């Protein structure tokens, strides 16, 4: 029987074109995050920016703070948005995040002193963190199983697209007024202001009736039994959240008390603690493979390996953005087919080889790159190799896995905690890397190499061998029908409990089953209504193979 596990992603995305469009819209949050990651590295080396903030230009430690203060704000935003998204809904938390983001962006791009710059970047980062927490969760809950990995990978693709365009905007605006003493302040204010426009687009969405939204997304009439069942499932999910909190904490428990207890359970309940450790360790390891350290300080790095001249420097940096973006596309197309674990292992191997090469070249030619330019370009190429390998592996899996491994009742807060851990690690990396590059030079990349190796070993021994089965894709094409029986990975909730211990998933399953019975949702009837569609899909696939 021909396999189409994960569904060839292009066909799946075309079939679910409205969901794909909505996913692209929601992924603007990722574009904003990526844009800032890329734009700040170019702005830091612009002549007028250095003249405007002379203390910042001469102090590597202060540079680390101006970069990392954004990630500190993002950590706070990701942490607080867990309960906010549960309370206000995913959509309204996205809109709130964009308002906060816009305020920070305006302060940052109009900064007249370091205090304004720091405050603007912190507020801006808070909005970024809120978006980074809720967008992957929103996409994973919105998507049918067969294209879930592809849609959530769009978050990473949008990040890389933001990084790519930021480099080239920096490259273009650096010539406003010249690249020397006469350079205009617009050279760096314009790149910082550009990020306001995608945020304004994202903040203009309008509310529609839930059933009409489903009609548009699924492209079936309101009378379709599957659509009605999905609508009831959404209603069941709301009832499930309310009933779970009442059963666990009592009817009179305050929202603050419930939120505190749920965060506490992530560390005190054994099976939740194991899932939390896996989700948070993945975020921590990702940052210390070196990605954001490279993205934030690329111009300084390329200058240190002999690529002299501001234009050459920014060109080399711009290629990083292109490689990053193009290398993310295979993950969007094939991640559901490859599986998370295999992708992480292959990515760890590729990143380890690249980091070893960069570190060794720098150690050997550290003081002679000027007279050995080929060695500098070789190091540059291996940085591109690292970026490409990172992009198709942990860059995408990092956003997906935290949304997949937790029981429904606590998923929002767990994802918020995992993303907050990402930003804590990002903050530390952004803060210490400038000093590492100055003091231990090539040792910085040996440090990153160690974490690339740890990623491979940790994934091999600790990440479960699971990927979505073809049967599940055919049996449950609508996401909400699936949620009653399975976690977001496509692994039955009972099996997730076996992997991590505990029985909270099974308890959730029984609770959802009771609610479904109350609402009259009947999976057997839904299954019969799918038979003809499944036969048509199989005939199409067999004819194409």
Q: Where does each model-flagged region fall?
A:
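Alpha-helical transmembrane bundle of multi-pass membrane proteins
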Residues: 1-216, 232, 239-545
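Short arginine-rich
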Residues: 219-226, 507
């Amino acid at each position: 029987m021909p396999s189409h596990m994960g569904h060839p992603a292009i066909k799946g995305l075309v079939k679910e074109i409205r969901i794909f469009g909505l996913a692209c819209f929601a992924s603007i949050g990722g574009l904003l995050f990526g844009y800032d990651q890329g734009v700040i590295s170019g702005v830091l080396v612009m002549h007028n920016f250095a003249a405007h903030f002379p203390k910042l230009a001469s102090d590597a430690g202060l540079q680390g703070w101006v970069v990392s203060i954004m990630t500190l704000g993002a950590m706070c935003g990701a942490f607080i948005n867990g309960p906010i998204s549960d309370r206000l809904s995913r959509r309204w938390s996205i809109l709130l995040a964009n308002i906060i983001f816009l305020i920070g962006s305006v302060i940052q791009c109009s900064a007249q002193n370091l205090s304004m710059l720091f405050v603007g970047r912190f507020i801006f980062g808070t909005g970024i963190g809120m978006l980074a927490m809720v967008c992957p969760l929103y996409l994973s809950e919105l998507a049918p199983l067969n294209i879930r990995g592809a849609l959530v990978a769009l978050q990473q693709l949008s990040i890389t697209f933001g990084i790519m365009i930021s480099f080239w905007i920096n490259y273009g605006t650096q010539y406003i007024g010249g690249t020397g003493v006469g350079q205009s302040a617009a050279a760096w204010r314009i790149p910082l202001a550009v990020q306001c426009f995608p945020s304004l687009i994202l903040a203009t969405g309008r509310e529609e009736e839930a059933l009409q939204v489903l009609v548009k997304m699924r492209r079936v009439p309101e009378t379709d039994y599957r659509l009605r069942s999905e609508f009831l499932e959404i209603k069941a999910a709301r009832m499930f959240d309310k009933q779970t909190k009442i059963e666990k904490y009592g009817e009179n428990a305050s929202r603050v008390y419930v939120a505190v207890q749920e965060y506490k359970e992530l560390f005190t309940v054994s099976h939740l603690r194991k899932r939390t450790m896996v989700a948070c360790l993945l975020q921590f390891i990702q940052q210390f493979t070196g990605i954001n350290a490279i993205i934030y300080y690329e111009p300084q790095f390329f200058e240190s390996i002999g690529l002299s001249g501001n234009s050459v420097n920014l060109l080399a940096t711009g290629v990083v953005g292109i490689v990053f973006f193009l290398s993310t596309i295979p993950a969007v197309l094939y991640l559901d087919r490859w599986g998370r674990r295999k992708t992480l292992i292959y990515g760890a191997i590729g990143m380890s080889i690249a980091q070893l090469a960069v570190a060794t070249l720098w150690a050997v030619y550290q003081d002679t790159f000027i007279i050995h330019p080929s060695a500098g370009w070789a190091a540059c190429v291996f940085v591109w190799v690292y970026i490409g390998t990172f992009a198709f592996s942990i860059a995408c899996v990092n956003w997906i896995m935290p949304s997949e491994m937790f029981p429904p009742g606590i998923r929002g807060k767990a994802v918020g905690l995992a993303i907050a851990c990402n930003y804590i690690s990002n903050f530390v990396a952004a803060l210490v890397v400038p000093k590492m590059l100055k003091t231990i030079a090539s040792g910085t990349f040996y440090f990153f190499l160690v974490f690339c190796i740890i990623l491979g070993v940790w994934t091999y021994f600790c990440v479960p061998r699971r990927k979505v089965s073809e049967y599940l894709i055919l049996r449950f094409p609508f996401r909400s029908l699936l949620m009653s029986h399975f976690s977001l990975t496509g692994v039955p909730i009972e099996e997730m409990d076996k992997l991590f211990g505990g029985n909270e998933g099974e308890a959730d399953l029984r609770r959802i089953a009771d609610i479904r019975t109350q609402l009259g949702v009947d999976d057997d009837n839904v299954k019969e209504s799918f038979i003809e569609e499944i036969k048509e899909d199989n005939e199409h696939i067999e004819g194409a193979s």
